[in-house]
Amino acid sequence: MLLKTILNSIEKYKGFVYKDIKLTGEPSNLMLEILIEPRRNSRGVCRGCSDLCSGYDTQSIRRYEYIPLWGIAVFFLYRPRRLNCPECGIHVEQVPWAVGKHRLTQRYAWFLSRWAKRLSWKETAKAFGTSWHHVYRSVEMAVDWGLKHRSLEGVKSIGVDEIAWRKGHKYQTLVYQIDTHCKRLLWIGDERTEDTLYGFFNMFGKKRSAQLEYVCSDMWKAYLNVIAERASQAIHILDRFHIVAHLNKAIDQVRAAEARQMKEDGYDPLLTNTRWLLLKNPENLTEKQEIKLKELVQYNLKSVRSYLLKEDFQRLWQYSSKYWAGKFIDKWCTRTMRSKIDPMKKVAKMIRGHKELMLNWFEANGQLSSGVVEGFNNKAKLTMRKAYGYKSPNLLKISLYHTLGDLPMPKTTHRFF
C-alpha cells in the first residue's frame, strides 16, 4: 500500500492533495517530506472570519512537523496562500492541519500531549526527536481544548487543598471533584487566600455551588470562611489526614525539644533515631522498629505520652455515632490539656475550636473519603518532582490540569499507540 494511500485514508483534507513524497537526509537522520498543494480551483479559508476566499498570491514553503513514522521524522511542505477577503482584507489562509503559525500539525500536537501524560516533557521531546517547547505547546493546546469542552454538571462533592510549589510559602489552591463516579482536578488558583477560593466559586457558578452536598478541606481559616459563605448547604468535612498531620507535627516538636534537653542534662540518648517510630502508624513499622518502640514506651517521657495521646485519638474514626464521637473528643481534649505538653495542648485547642466540623465526618456516614484529596495531592507532588520543579505557576497549572484534570479529547480515528 502506498504511503499516499494511507495518508488519504487517515489525514484527508478537503481542498488539498498530497503530491510528491521524498525520503531525504543521511541514513542516521532520515526525513520524509510530503508536499501538499491546494486542489485546482479550490478556495482558501480566511483566518479572520473563516469564509472561503480566492487566493491573492503564495508565500514561501513552510514545514509542518507530523507524527514520526518508523522512527523517521515526517514533515508536511506547503506554500500558504494569501487570500483577498472582502471582510478582513489580505490574510494568510488557515490550513486544516495546523493552527495559526504553529509549525506542528494538530495531529502531532495531540500525539505529543498524550505521551506527555506518561513521560516527562523532556523525555517526550527526546523520544520523538522534537523540542521541549513543542511538547509544552502541545500540552497547552490540549489543556485549553479540554477546559473549553469539559462538563461541570453533576458535581456533588469537592475537596479543597493547597500545595507548596516553591520555597518562600508560594502556594497553589487546588479544588478536586471527589464524587464516587468521577474524581478529577477542577480548578487551580494562585495563593491560598479568601480571594483565591472566591475565584473558584465565581467560575463554578451559583447554581452549581448550591447543588454541592459535601465539601472537604483542611482547617485553613480562609477556606473555612469562603466555604461557609458560598456552600453553606453542603456538609463541610475536615480532612482527617490534616488533623493527624497536626498531631504528628506536635509530637515531632516535643521529641526534638526533649532530645536536646536530655543531651544537655547528660542522659542517655533514648530519643536518637526515634522520629519515625513515633510518627508511623503501628502497622507500618518494621520488626526492628516494633521492638525499639516497645522498649521506648516503658519510659515516662513527654514524647512517649504525646505518642500515646495521638494513638488514642485515632480511635475517634471507629465511632459510628456522632453523639458519642463528640463525647470522645471532649474527653480526649480534657486529658490532653492536663498533660502539660504545650504542643499537644495547642492541637487540643484547635480540635475543640473545630469540633462541629470534625463531627460532620460522622454525619456524612462514610459517603465521602477525604483520602482522595490526599491521594490527588501526592500525584500533584509526583508531577512536580518528575518535572524537577516549575519556573512559573502557569507551567504548573498546565501540567496539573493535563495530568489530573481528566480533560476530554477530540474523537479521532487513530491514536498511533
In which residue ranges do the predicted regions lie?
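Short, conserved DNA-binding cores of transcription-related domains
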Residues: 1-90
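Acidic/histidine-rich catalytic cores and adjacent linkers
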Residues: 43, 48, 54, 167-169, ...
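Short, positively charged, Gly/Tyr-enriched micro-motifs
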Residues: 50-53, 60-169, 209-210
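Acidic, glycine-enriched active-site microenvironments
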Residues: 101-110, 187-190, 338, 345-346, ...
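The DNA-recognition helices of helix-turn-helix-type DNA-binding domains
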Residues: 131, 142-146, 219, 234, ...
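RNase H-like nuclease fold core
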Residues: 134, 138-216, 221-226
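Short secondary-structure boundary/capping segments
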Residues: 174-175, 229-234, 251-256
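Short alpha-helix plus adjacent loop in nuclease-associated cores
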Residues: 243-264
